[in-house]
Amino acid sequence: MQLREDLTPKQIVEELDKYIVGQKEAKKAVAIALRNRWRRHKLPEDLRDEVIPKNILMIGPTGVGKTEIARRLASLVGAPFIKVEATKFTEVGYVGRDVESIIRELAEASFKMVKAEKMEKVREKAKEIAEEKILDYLVPMRVKRYGTLETFEEETSPAREKFRQMLRNGELDERTVEIDVEEKGVSVVGGVIAPGLEDIENQLKDLFSSLAPTKRKRRKMTVREAMRVLEQQEAEKLIDMDEVASEAVYRAENFGIVFIDEIDKVAGKSTGSSPDVSREGVQRDLLPIVEGTTVSTKYGPVKTDHILFIAAGAFHLSKPSDLIPELQGRFPIRVELQPLTKDDFVKILTQPKNALIKQYKALMATEGVDIEFTDDAIEAIAEIAEQVNEKTENIGARRLHTILERIMEDYSFEAPDLKGQHIIIDEKVIRSKLGDIIQSEDLTRYIL
């Protein structure tokens, strides 16, 4: 995916509207933050370094679209993106993940993205080389009496071309061939590191794998699989990994987006007592990363000055002012996301590109079953979702997944026997499947 930094704020919001219902304020904030990056790149170099991104703090209950907005935003512009949970990190000196691993993960995501792009560019060339190698296995070159190679073009060319055509038509896909596959040395580190020290384990694995020589192993596989393996091998040979690493670091530094979820869980609760030392320690460790520092990664040092950080939390038991003042100041843009209503649920079920109703219809269509939800059924599902969220924990749009799974359970199980049928799901069906559960609060808690 190529970087698309030239999108206007309106275009960004329009794209986000295709997947996320409501939350206009949050969409507007991230759209402006993204456009400001494009504006920064248009500035003279001496001024460019002075402009830092305005990090965003999203406040709102679970299931209202906080994570989805950040993920879709990154996907939209082709930027390196990672989501981390603040609760997974501990203060330096305690067992747990080190906050610098956030940037290492971002660099890794950036590297994979750039590598995939570069490999796509050389895909055709790699395919040609892989094809020739497969043909070498299928139509081997003749050997002279004294052991030297000779191609005998006038004899082998017609046969080779015939096999080439058959290969391209897929006629040889199931034939078995033996090919030489490159294999890295087996890691000797796995499973010996204590929990919480995964970063050290990964670094040791990388070190040992780089020291281990590349082995060639002869493997038997189908022509289809051999083409895929050889194409991958050849594509990796055609790209310059140093160039990929350099580009990955540049993108992580200038276009990276880090989404820190559950930031409220490391905020000191307003109990009047002193804040939890470990929680405050995580905040203090996060501070230099968000402020701007340099983190060593296996692809090179990554400066965090221009990475966009989006933090999110429900803040049920704490409030943003419970965060340490220094960290509060690093998230100048505050956006409150609204709880979802019945009308929002109706839209979520039908309007987005990836709407749940569309997903279930497509899944059942693979079995030859045509499912249709009536308007009153959709209204009933939305109403039930709102009721259950009010009665129990409010988990937002995620409640729809639970309810729909319950409704579709029998149809999904019997789908192979329902082939060719047109099934209409109306309000009566919804009420009959969920009525008893909704009336009993105990059942609601456990089943929906």
Curated annotation (Swiss-Prot):
Residues where ATP binds: V21, G63, V64, G65, K66, T67, E68, D261, E326, R398
Subcellular localization: Cytoplasm
CDD domains cross-referenced by the UniProt entry: RecA-like_HslU
SUPFAM superfamilies: P-loop containing nucleoside triphosphate hydrolases (SSF52540)
Cited Pfam families: AAA, AAA_2, ClpB_D2-small
GO BP term (any one): proteolysis involved in protein catabolic process
Top-rank taxon: Bacteria
Keywords: ATP-binding, Chaperone, Cytoplasm, Nucleotide-binding
Family recorded in the similarity comment: Belongs to the ClpX chaperone family. HslU subfamily.
Stated role: ATPase subunit of a proteasome-like degradation complex; this subunit has chaperone activity. The binding of ATP and its subsequent hydrolysis by HslU are essential for unfolding of protein substrates subsequently hydrolyzed by HslV. HslU recognizes the N-terminal part of its protein substrates and unfolds these before they are guided to HslV for hydrolysis.
Subunit composition and interactions: A double ring-shaped homohexamer of HslV is capped on each side by a ring-shaped HslU homohexamer. The assembly of the HslU/HslV complex is dependent on binding of ATP.
Official protein name in the record: ATP-dependent protease ATPase subunit HslU
Protein's organism: Persephonella marina (strain DSM 14350 / EX-H1)
Gene: hslU
